[in-house]
A protein has these predicted regions:
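N-terminal "arm"/small-domain region of PLP-dependent enzymes with the aminotransferase-like
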Residues: 1-61, 69
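Conserved PLP-enzyme active-site core in the AAT-like
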Residues: 3-4, 12-21, 79-283, 288, ...
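Glycine-rich beta-alpha junction loops
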Residues: 17, 31-37, 187, 239, ...
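A common structural junction motif
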Residues: 240-241, 330-338, 391-395
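Conserved C-terminal alpha-helix-loop-beta "cap" of PLP-dependent enzymes
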Residues: 284-372, 376
Length: 395
């Protein structure tokens, strides 16, 4: 079902839908591990990839196929692959395209587990990793080598919301024809930016976050061109990680996507109001948000993003101790990691999501001990602000 000319909300609801035997409106959950062949010959043809069809849910399942079709349509890519987590998506992709002797250029500022994979995981298997500030294109250019296979980054970056010019970076990376640019689009989602349209080769997501949107699923997604997607499915996913998404979880994300556009509108609208509140508050030292004209990446964000997102990071006067006081006194906002849920979530990156970093590595990445990260939810914005206000009063 071709939906690329439809609006984003229509695409999220209708794209990739498969007809089924009973004509159900909701996508059925095909809760099966394996699929029956009509004959031995058919089984042989499917294993030889001479005939389309399902074999085993680790390789594909009708429910997950619909989700894969939807994310491919939303990102305007050729093919999607569903995984059991965001880290499963990242690991399966990297284990497909990398080998010993390859070189990776990545950013100093990454989600903590991604940083650990880059810093401690890949290097154990003979992959060289160089950490730079990817928003500084000269640093990227200077880090490139003949054996650079991957340039990997997030934008906006977790947790300080650094912005990278994807179009300019992709042009630099592709001066080496063997280099792939991989972008984690979890924070922005295809609601705000479509990296593949800006020259990026592969997009990865933690679908746990905004795409599902309800805090009840762990999942990851990859979108890229068909040939590369097939390699990731049949090498990285099938053989290297086995990070398979179950049909039940795929169903939840399919359902969550039906409200994707309207949820993102509310998330972003709430965030803009809260940024204005925090930016004027006397106990707040600094607010990090791409929609602020004072943000170093504001002009780039305005160019490549439809909106500025619903993630806010800020530092309080009084540093970490002030931050702990705030976190421990909130009533409505939930003290929890993750993001993109209907509930507003708040956490302390240095001691939580980014604890794999040493203090020196955090400082180099711009993750201070006093930084607080806020994932703005869908509650009435005046209630979120009232809770933040009473928490700040305790400092």
């Amino acid at each position: 079902m071709e939906m690329k000319k439809s609006g984003l909300g229509t695409t999220a609801i209708h794209a990739g839908t498969l007809k089924n035997l009973y004509g159900t409106l909701a996508m059925p959950i095909y809760q099966t591990s394996t699929f029956i062949f009509d004959s031995a010959e058919q089984g042989g043809r499917r294993f030889a990839l001479e005939e389309a069809g399902y074999i085993y849910t680790r390789l594909g399942n009708p429910t997950t196929t619909v989700l894969e079709n939807k994310i491919a349509a939303l990102e305007e890519g050729e093919a999607g692959i569903a995984m059991s987590s965001g880290m499963g998506a990242i690991s399966s992709t990297l284990w497909t395209v990398l080998k010993a002797g390859d070189h990776v250029v990545t950013d100093k500022t990454l989600y903590g587990c991604t940083f650990a994979l880059m810093n401690h995981g890949l290097t154990r298997f003979g992959v060289e990793v160089t950490f730079v500030d990817t928003s500084n294109l000269e640093e990227v250019k200077n880090a490139m080598k003949k054996n650079t296979r991957v340039v990997y980054l997030e934008t906006p970056a977790n947790p300080n919301l650094k912005i990278v010019d994807l179009e300019a970076l992709s042009k630099i990376a592709h001066t080496n024809p063997n280099t792939l640019v991989i972008v984690d689009n979890t924070f922005a989602t295809p609601y705000m930016q479509k990296p593949l349209k800006l020259g990026v080769d592969i997009v990865v997501h933690s679908a746990t976050k905004y795409l599902n949107g309800h805090g009840d699923v762990i999942a990851g997604l990859v979108v890229t061109r068909q040939e590369l997607a097939d390699q990731i499915r049949f090498v990285g996913l099938k053989d290297m990680t086995g990070a398979v998404l179950g049909p039940q979880e795929a169903y939840y994300i399919i359902r969550g996507l039906k409200t994707f556009e309207i949820r993102m509108e509310r998330h972003c609208k709430n965030a803009r109001t809260i940024v204005d509140f925090l930016n004027k508050h006397p106990k707040v030292e600094k607010v990090y948000y791409p929609g602020l004209e004072t943000h170093s990446g504001y002009e780039i964000a305005k160019k490549q993003m439809k909106d500025f997102g619903a993630m806010i990071s800020f530092e309080l006067k009084g540093g970490f101790e002030a931050g702990k006081t705030l976190l421990n006194n909130l009533k409505l906002c939930s003290l929890a990691v993750s993001l993109g849920d209907t509930e507003t979530l708040i956490q302390h990156p240095a001691s939580m999501t980014h604890s794999p970093y040493t203090k020196e590595e955090r400082e180099a990445a711009g993750i201070t001990d006093g930084l607080v990260r806020l994932s703005v939810g869908l509650e009435n914005v005046e209630d979120i602000i009232a809770d933040l206000e009473q928490g700040l009063e305790k400092i």
